Amino acid sequence: MAGSIYGKLFRVSTWGESHGKGVGVVVDGCPAGLELSEEDIQVYLNRRKPGQSRFTTPRKEDDRVEILSGVFEGKTTGTPISMVVMNYTQRSGDYSEIAGYYRPGHADYTFDVKYGFRDYRGGGRSSARETIARVAAGAIAAKLLKQFGIEILTYTKAIGPVEIDYQRFDRNEIQKNALAMPDAEAAAQAEVYLESVMKGHDSSGGMAECIVTGVPAGIGEPVFDKLDANLAKAIVSIGAVKGFEIGDGMAVAKAIGSENNDGFVMKDGTVAKLSNHAGGTLGGISDGAPLVIRAAFKPTPSILHEQSTVNKSGEDITVSIKGRHDPIVVPRAVVVVEAMAALTLIDLLFENMTARLDKIREFYGIEETEK
């Protein structure tokens, strides 16, 4: 199976299935000398861990990470960093019934068509549990970005029809409520909404928003490797994501040029923007303003509602999906969005080191010898 490797210079290779022995990742390209511990990784993994509230799957997993290589005496060595998280509470018997049919909204059918075989126990590689590896690698990328003054804040912007009010935005609320919303009032409304959805044996979609500050101007490559194009690929690669926006996103289709353009001004000796409709990029290159991206997540497809599908014999049948499932994925997925943004940014930041000859000379302490 191709498609499990991401990045050029900061390169991650993920492996494992939801109901296998574990999931893991190998990170290649992390510079030597970064202070790194398992606890640095665990902080991020705890944010996506299941079983933390009534709005997540009741499957209980400690999701304890173990660093197998690439770290010595508390610092990265510059060699590949291998990490693993073992699975302990998988109940594959919950999925034996679905071996003979395709679950609506899942990748069962497409995996079967492509490979002629599928791991029906929780979806295999298409399971959300695959994102553990992304988060572990993203934790390292985020720590590297902090060395350059780049910070990432990700939270739940909307759950179903309930959206946060930026007038009540409080980043401290993100860790206080079960839905990772920076608005206590909206979080309370969203809980009521989710309770009604769950009583109807249904699930809800939602939206995550990610703000990246401290990104210097000049990150990203023109044409096919634009910063926003890479971010879009990274975010949409997350299993349940069906939409991506940067800046004003889809709203630009209804705007006029005088509304949409961000004016420039000199501020403290540098070029700054008067607004940020573009979301931090111009021409696929960072412009120094905060990156503002959003990801739309579909409702969890595993629901107790009766749904139409077909079995492997080609017969039409009706099914309802039993098992342990999230009624909404966004609160646990915000850290996955954060991880993929971090992986994209650190990779492009490293790539940008080769963009200018004068900067390469400066790095190596070489004087210019000829024009």
Feature locations, PLM:
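N-terminal, positively charged regions that mediate nucleic acid binding
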Residues: 1-59
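A short glycine/serine-rich beta->alpha loop
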Residues: 11-14, 119-130, 217-221, 276-281, ...
